[in-house]
């Protein structure tokens, strides 16, 4: 199991995943990322979606890499710090529980 999978599993089990997702959604909205991605989708659809042959899957495949690069570094850092805090708190709780 990778570190990423372990963190993902822990956050799901502890209930912190929804808090992290809420924080991410709020920050992406606040910084205008969602609007940028919406415009990117609209632009791609206008360029390639003249017929009905352009599928949602194709749009997602094209938009995802560009959208990921648009996420501000400050948002990435904040989420990373939040995850580290959650894991550190968990580690402290485990150590406290193990002490006699």
Curated annotation (Swiss-Prot):
Taxonomy, superkingdom? Eukaryota
GO MF annotations, alphabetized: C2H2 zinc finger domain binding; chromatin insulator sequence binding; TFIID-class transcription factor complex binding; transcription coactivator activity
Q: What Gene3D superfamilies does the annotation carry?
A: 1.10.246.140
Query: Subcellular location, in the record's words?
Result: Nucleus, Nucleoplasm; Cytoplasm
The record's subunit annotation is: Component of the nuclear pore complex (NPC)-associated AMEX complex (anchoring and mRNA export complex), composed of at least e(y)2 and xmas-2. Component of the SAGA transcription coactivator-HAT complexes, at least composed of Ada2b, e(y)2, Pcaf/Gcn5, Taf10 and Nipped-A/Trrap. Within the SAGA complex, e(y)2, Sgf11, and not/nonstop form an additional subcomplex of SAGA called the DUB module (deubiquitination module). Component of the THO complex, composed of at least e(y)2, HPR1, THO2, THOC5, THOC6 and THOC7. Interacts with e(y)1. Interacts with su(Hw) (via zinc fingers).
- Gene name of this polypeptide: e(y)2
Q: Which organism is it from?
A: Drosophila ananassae
Q: What does this protein do?
A: Involved in mRNA export coupled transcription activation by association with both the AMEX and the SAGA complexes. The SAGA complex is a multiprotein complex that activates transcription by remodeling chromatin and mediating histone acetylation and deubiquitination. Within the SAGA complex, participates in a subcomplex that specifically deubiquitinates histone H2B. The SAGA complex is recruited to specific gene promoters by activators, where it is required for transcription. Required for nuclear receptor-mediated transactivation.
A GO cellular-component term linked to this record: nuclear periphery
Give the protein name, as stated in the record: Enhancer of yellow 2 transcription factor
Give the GO biological process terms.
heterochromatin boundary formation; mRNA export from nucleus; poly(A)+ mRNA export from nucleus; positive regulation of transcription by RNA polymerase II; protein transport; transcription elongation by RNA polymerase II
Nucleotide-binding recorded as keyword: no
Keywords noted in UniProt: Activator, Chromatin regulator, Cytoplasm, mRNA transport, Nucleus, Protein transport, Transcription, Transcription regulation, Translocation, Transport
Similarity field: Belongs to the ENY2 family.
